[in-house]
Amino acid sequence: INEKLFSLPFDKAVEFFEETLRNKIRKENYAGFKSIIAYRTGLKIICNEDLARNDFLDEEMEWFGRKAKGFRDYLFCKTMEIAKELDVPFQVHTGAGDRDIKLELSRPSYLTDLVRKYEGKIVLVHAGFPYHRESAWMAYLFPSVYLDVSQVFPFATTAGKDVLREVLQISPINKVMYGSDTFELPEIAWVSAKLFRKYITEVAEEMEREEIIDDKEKVIKMVAEENASKLY
């Protein structure tokens, strides 16, 4: 969140945050929202306005700025509400990341109570790897939950095949999406696509041989592009 929010009164800060989100969709044609709260205060999120008000005034600092966990949690919950209101996906970073990630607080399952009755669309990006089985089960259990395998390809290299296999064993196929999480170097995108195409083909062939699916090409196309096109 922008540190300038802390220069406003609590109610004004929340109002400004909400209006900014709505404008991004309505006026700037954003496709959805993304949270990296896993990098800040983790995914053990509590939606409590009183706690948010108290933490808003707390001046405890972290490397990223004011900690204000209760306030950050509250804005996360507000984002869920607005994403549902505007019918756009809300991506949430889960699992491993850069060296500043709070990995012990980034397990997808920490979001279980928040998504249990949620009627919007939550995307667990990076499939929560290495906690991808949790993401797959959540996608199976809760209508609101989707996942993508960005970052797994190419950074998990050959483990990407295992991740795809394990995710597709549990999650509905129409809830799994390819992604790369690539940046800066175009070669990373190329390697990601190359590995994904290889392993999704191998996994789909295995599933067809085991008679779990009857059309491997359809499954490949769904995960590679169709699911994301429908969601976004």
Can you say where each PLM-predicted feature lies in the sequence?
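Long, mid-chain structured domain cores
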Residues: I1-V14, E18
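Short amphipathic alpha-helices and their capping/turn segments at secondary-structure boundaries
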Residues: V14-F33, F76-E85, L164-S171
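His/Asp/Glu-enriched short active-site or ligand-binding loop at hydrolase and phosphoryl-transfer sites
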Residues: Y146-T157
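Short acidic/histidine-rich active-site segments
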Residues: H93, V125-H126, S171-A193
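Mid-to-C-terminal alpha-helical segments outside catalytic/metal-binding sites
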Residues: I173-K175, W190-Y232
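Glycine-enriched alpha-helix->loop->beta-strand junction motifs that scaffold or abut catalytic
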Residues: L86-P89, K117-K121, Y140-Y146, I173-N174, ...
